Amino acid sequence: MHTKAIYPGTFDPVTNGHTDLIERAAKLFKQVVIGIAANPSKQPRFSLEERVKLVKRVTEHLDNVEVVGFSGLLVDFAKEQNASVLVRGLRAVSDFEYEFQLANMNRRLSADLESVFLTPAEENSFISSTLVKEVALHGGDVSQFVHEEVAKALQKKD
C-alpha cells in the first residue's frame, strides 16, 4: 500500500476544488504532502510563502496533511519526501491530455512514481485559480469558490 502521496500545484490561490481533492486524498493515503511549486514563470499573484500559509490555513483540520513549498523538478521533490504517488486533479476531459503527458514524463524520470487522478465534486469542477483571480481582480465575490481566508487575502491584493 502507498502510504505517502504528494499533491503538487501552484495553488495561486488555493480553491474549494483543491480543498475537495486534498480532503479526499487524505482519506486515501496515510500521509499527503501538498507540494507548492515556486514556479516563477507563472508570475504568481501570491508569493510562495503566502501560498504555503493559505494552504496550511485551509487544511489545518486534516491531521495527515503537510504543506511544503518547493522548487525544481517534481520527481526530485517526491524522492526527497519519500513519496511514491502523485495526486493530480482532472476538472474536464481537456485536462487529461496534458496530465497524461506529464504522468508519462514523470514515470520516465522516476519509474517508481505513480500518478493517481481524482476528479472534483461537480460543484467544484469549473473552478480554477485563474478564474478566481480574474473575478477577484474585477471586484467580484469569490467567497463561494475559496475559503474565507483566501477571499480576504485576494481582497487585500487588489
Curated annotation (Swiss-Prot):
Keyword set includes Zinc? no
Q: Name one Pfam family in it.
A: CTP_transf_like
What are its E.C. numbers? Answer: 2.7.7.3
Which GO BP terms sit in this record? coenzyme A biosynthetic process
Q: Report one GO cellular component.
A: cytoplasm
Q: Where is this site: Transition state stabilizer?
A: H18
Q: Which GO terms describe its molecular function?
A: ATP binding; pantetheine-phosphate adenylyltransferase activity
Do you know which InterPro entries this protein is assigned to? Answer: Cyt_trans-like, PPAT, Rossmann-like_a/b/a_fold
Q: Where does ATP bind?
A: T10, F11, H18, G89, L90, R91, E99, N124, S125, F126, I127, S128, S129, T130
Which enzyme class, named as a word?
A: transferase
- Catalysed reactions, as listed in the record: (R)-4'-phosphopantetheine + ATP + H(+) = 3'-dephospho-CoA + diphosphate
Q: Which cofactor does it need?
A: Mg(2+)
Gene3D superfamilies noted in UniProt: HUPs
Annotated compartments: Cytoplasm
Q: Which key words tag this protein in UniProt? A: ATP-binding, Coenzyme A biosynthesis, Cytoplasm, Magnesium, Nucleotide-binding, Nucleotidyltransferase, Transferase
CDD domains assigned: PPAT
> Which superkingdom does the taxonomy of this entry point to?
Bacteria
Detail which positions bind substrate.
T10, K42, L74, R88
Could you tell me which pathway this protein works in?
Cofactor biosynthesis; coenzyme A biosynthesis; CoA from (R)-pantothenate: step 4/5
Q: Report the function annotation for this chain.
A: Reversibly transfers an adenylyl group from ATP to 4'-phosphopantetheine, yielding dephospho-CoA (dPCoA) and pyrophosphate.
Q: Which family is this protein grouped under?
A: Belongs to the bacterial CoaD family.
| Subunit organization | Homohexamer.
Q: Give the protein's recorded name.
A: Phosphopantetheine adenylyltransferase
Species source reads Shewanella loihica (strain ATCC BAA-1088 / PV-4)
